[in-house]
Amino acid sequence: MAKLYFYYAAMNAGKSTVLLQSSYNYRERGMQTLLFTPAIDTRYQYGTICSRIGLSEQAYAFNNTDNLYVLTQELQLQATKYSCVLIDEAQFLTREQVYQLTEITDQMSIPVLAYGLRTDFRGELFPGSQFLLAWADELIELKTICHCGRKATMNMRIDENGQAVVEGEQVLIGGNESYVATCRLHYKRGEAGKTFPGNKLFNKDTNTF
């Protein structure tokens, strides 16, 4: 029986890397995969899933009004049967689109692997993540670390000076220049441990790199 999987994590946990590796594993065995990425993510070339380690793959860029169940049916008519559907940045899905993913698994018997953030910079659930947590068959946490070495579970938004931002719109597309993953303790303290050129972390206790 096909299942809906939600792989969630904080920023920079390698979600896109794991997605691309999973797709490669299917294709290496002669199976077809369908990749989706939200059009709202403008960090990279349109319709491309990119990882921080340099991997990339073409994907179907969807908007929040697209019906992913219908799209999958239509795209499958143009190709052989898909063995897996993979969604990048799944936190941007709408409630309706998460329901459509359940239809892909339940009606088409295709496993769906969704990868995304659990919470925003305010520590609140994204709509897509909320319903994936509620409806997915399997929940898998991908782990990354805070600058202190603890597991990072929070996403801190930072300004150009590396200071924590606590107000603003939920969605602000950005990478390492805008966000940093931290543990809950340093999230509450507003201490980002900002990475500077050369990948050296500034130690706020000793004022040294």
Swiss-Prot record:
Superkingdom as given in the UniProt entry: Bacteria
Any single GO molecular-function term of the entry would be: ATP binding
Protein localization: Cytoplasm
What keywords appear on the UniProt entry?
ATP-binding, Cytoplasm, DNA synthesis, Kinase, Metal-binding, Nucleotide-binding, Transferase, Zinc
EC identifiers of the protein: 2.7.1.21
The residues listed in the UniProt record as binding Zn(2+), with positions renumbered to this chain, are C146, C148, C183, H186
- Which InterPro entries does the UniProt entry name for this protein? P-loop_NTPase, Thymidine_kinase, Thymidine_kinase_CS
| Family statement drawn from the similarity comment of this UniProt entry | Belongs to the thymidine kinase family.
Q: What is this protein called?
A: Thymidine kinase
Q: Which organism is it from?
A: Legionella pneumophila (strain Lens)
